[in-house]
């Protein structure tokens, strides 16, 4: 039977999951939405309350964006305007201007923001991605607890899982 190729039997069992590759996955985020929230706030300070109702600094994926948002919150709380100059000056005083990308990066944030009018939608995207990242984190914690129950029963583990997921739902 020359020329006959071996026949590949259809796979009937699910492929084994490669847990080593799980560590290579990039958590969900939207750098563009984060940039547009920050840039939009520099363009329109009046939208602060809309944004602050939706996101907190921990919702931002990148450390520089978390620092920028935190500094914006400080400016807002002190009654100072949030714009390129005041934000850069405040970050410089905190010793963080270079670590967030410098003056040029802050300028790009406001310059590249599509529209400050859509800032609530951008903030919703940032929050949505943060919730999904938290779900992933909790799922990993639950899996770790299952692999190493430390004497806990399955009921204890279910209670743990339920409380952790419920905490996300409440936030």
Predicted features and spans:
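Extended, charged alpha-helical coiled-coil/arm scaffolds that mediate oligomerization and mechanical coupling
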Residues: 103-171
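Noncatalytic partner-interaction/assembly domains of nucleic-acid and motor enzyme complexes
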Residues: 1-131
């Amino acid at each position: 039977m020359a020329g006959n190729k071996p026949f590949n039997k259809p796979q009937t069992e699910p492929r084994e999951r490669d847990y080593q590759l799980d560590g290579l996955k990039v958590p969900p985020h939207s750098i563009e939405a984060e940039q547009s929230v920050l840039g939009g706030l520099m363009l329109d300070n009046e939208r602060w309350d809309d944004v602050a109702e939706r996101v907190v600094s921990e919702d931002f994926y990148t450390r520089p964006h978390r620092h920028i948002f935190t500094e914006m919150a400080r400016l807002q709380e002190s009654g100072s305007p949030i714009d390129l100059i005041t934000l850069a000056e405040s970050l410089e005083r905190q010793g963080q201007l270079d670590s967030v990308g410098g003056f040029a990066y802050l300028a790009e944030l406001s310059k590249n923001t599509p529209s400050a009018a859509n800032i609530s939608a951008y903030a919703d995207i940032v929050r949505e991605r943060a919730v999904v990242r938290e779900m992933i984190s909790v799922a990993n914690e639950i899996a770790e607890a299952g692999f190493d129950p430390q004497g806990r029963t399955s009921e204890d583990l279910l209670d743990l899982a339920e409380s952790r997921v419920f905490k996300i739902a409440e936030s």
